[in-house]
Swiss-Prot record:
Organism: Burkholderia mallei (strain ATCC 23344)
A GO biological process held by the record: peptidoglycan biosynthetic process
Similarity comment text for this entry: Belongs to the EPSP synthase family. MurA subfamily.
Reactions the enzyme catalyzes: phosphoenolpyruvate + UDP-N-acetyl-alpha-D-glucosamine = UDP-N-acetyl-3-O-(1-carboxyvinyl)-alpha-D-glucosamine + phosphate
Active site (UniProt): 145
Protein keywords: Cell cycle, Cell division, Cell shape, Cell wall biogenesis/degradation, Cytoplasm, Peptidoglycan synthesis, Pyruvate, Transferase
GO cellular component: cytoplasm
Modified positions (2-(S-cysteinyl)pyruvic acid O-phosphothioketal) in chain numbering: 145
EC number(s) stated in the UniProt entry for this protein: 2.5.1.7
Protein name listed in UniProt: UDP-N-acetylglucosamine 1-carboxyvinyltransferase
């Protein structure tokens, strides 16, 4: 049986459940953003912790009975949903701003129900930790998703190679194992969440596990660093071959989540498109090399500090060709934002999407703003125009919504971006951060609309 799970933006699906946890859910399902374009951006923006690192790291808290202390955790809807899911299992958590303390000593319900999994595909990441520590896990299959999918088969195949008995019935993956055994696992494709799930499971397995064709994303590396801090034995971190020596137990640890390279890239792209001079703080340039290279090609000046990135842009950008691929190549999660940049650039450029089969849904909305984009299969030809014009547009997924915000910053007149609950899944207070550097962006709550 083949089932599917989104790999890179593991949580792009529509949220319908009310997130729990101590963090306040500040977004309403019908909120909109009103953007008055044409302003240069200037000032500083603090980059939040990485969503795609925080979610597996929160799930890794299940691997130990001792407290795991996390810093730089972003305040996002998906983080709150993950904490709600872990809380249902018996995990206790304390949250103070960007600091979260997890205590899994009393976890007694190793089940991830459909009600939460359908809102967030990253919920599959509890499968490996639950099975490794408790010998049992029951996790709902992820539901439908807007932008295409990748198979969860790789997770199941890898766990079966480690000795797990897995049955899929009534929409649930039910997995059992007295203790997982080390194995050599070769994934059919590069899978981020699959690598993370198998890596977490292998830390408590009996013997050596080798994961070949492992994902190399910085978020996978960040998870591995937390696991090592908890007592795991992992070699090959940052490469496509991970070697894990299983241990009897993992202990507590303290860890800071890496900066969000996609949030940083989105703001860099916004400045390159709209013009300005902005410094990003709390950012590591080396995890964003492919994006920085393309922005320089577009004409932006980017200065790299120890933990800062300064971007300066005058005039129109130059069109740049993009081809998405696995890290360290150009990330699929930045494709839509560069589409918006190319929409106002001088010249024309091709954008080719190789990761997802259905990730051009923002094209129709960008064209509503006056962009000139033609799609042919997995390639889009973007011919830049001097100016976009404000209009009402609708977000279809997380990164598409970011591209519409960037386009709105460049457009003449007002742009109204609807369904921004997508944006809130992956960006911590985007409108607040943009307003602080001179953008005219305001949230219209559902009650006002």
């Amino acid at each position: 049986m083949q089932v599917t799970v989104n790999e890179h933006d593991a949580v792009e699906c529509v949220a319908t459940a009310t997130p729990a946890g101590n963090r306040e859910a500040h977004a309403h399902g019908t909120d909109k953003l009103a953007i008055e374009g044409g302003r240069r951006l200037a000032g500083e923006i603090a980059v939040s912790g990485a969503k795609n690192a925080a979610l597996p790291i929160l799930c890794a808290g299940l691997l130990s009975a001792e407290p795991v202390r996390l810093d730089n955790v972003p305040d996002l809807k998906d983080v709150r949903t993950t904490l709600a899911l872990l809380g249902q299992m018996g995990m206790r958590e304390e949250t103070d701003g960007a600091r979260v303390v997890l205590d899994a000593s009393r976890v007694d319900n190793p089940v991830a129900p459909y009600e939460l999994v359908k809102t967030m595909r990253a919920s599959i990441l509890v499968l490996g930790p639950l099975l490794a520590r408790f010998g049992y896990a029951k996790v709902s299959l992820p539901g439908g998703c807007a932008i295409g999918a990748r198979p969860v088969d790789q997770h199941i195949k890898g766990l079966q190679a480690m000795g797990a008995e897995i049955h899929i019935e009534h929409g649930y993956i039910e997995a059992r194992a007295k203790r997982l055994s080390g194995a050599r696992i070769v994934t059919d494709m590069i899978t981020v969440t699959g690598t993370e799930n198998l890596l977490m499971a292998a830390t408590l397995a009996d013997g050596e596990t080798v994961i070949e064709n492992a994902a190399r994303e910085p978020e996978v590396t960040d998870l591995a660093h937390l696991l090592v801090a908890m007592g795991a034995k992992i070699d090959g971190i940052g490469t496509d071959r991970l070697v894990i020596q299983g241990v009897e137990r993992l202990h507590g640890a303290t860890h800071a989540v890496i900066p969000d390279r996609i949030e940083a890239g989105t703001f860099l792209c916004a400045v390159a498109a709209a013009g300005g001079d902005v410094t990003l703080t709390g950012m590591r340039a080396h995890i964003l090399d492919a994006v920085i290279d393309k922005l320089r090609e577009a004409g932006a000046t980017i200065d790299e500090g120890v933990d800062t990135l300064r971007v300066r842009m005058d005039g129109r950008p130059s069109a740049v060709a993009i081809r998405t691929s696995e890290y360290p190549a150009f990330p699929t999660d930045m494709q839509a934002q560069f589409m918006a940049l190319n929409a106002v650039a001088q010249g024309a450029a091709q954008v080719t999407e190789t990761i997802f089969e259905n990730r051009f849904m923002h094209v129709q909305e960008l064209n509503r703003l006056g962009a000139n984009i033609a799609v042919d299969g997995n390639t889009a030809l973007v011919t830049g125009v001097p100016k976009l014009s404000g209009a009402s547009v609708m977000a279809t997924d997380l990164r598409a919504s970011a591209s519409l915000v960037i386009a709105g910053l460049c457009a003449q007149g007002e742009t109204l971006v609807e369904r921004i609950y997508h944006l809130d899944r992956g960006y911590d207070r985007m409108e607040t951060k943009l307003t602080a550097v001179g953008a005219n962006v305001r949230r219209i709550s559902g009650s006002e609309a």
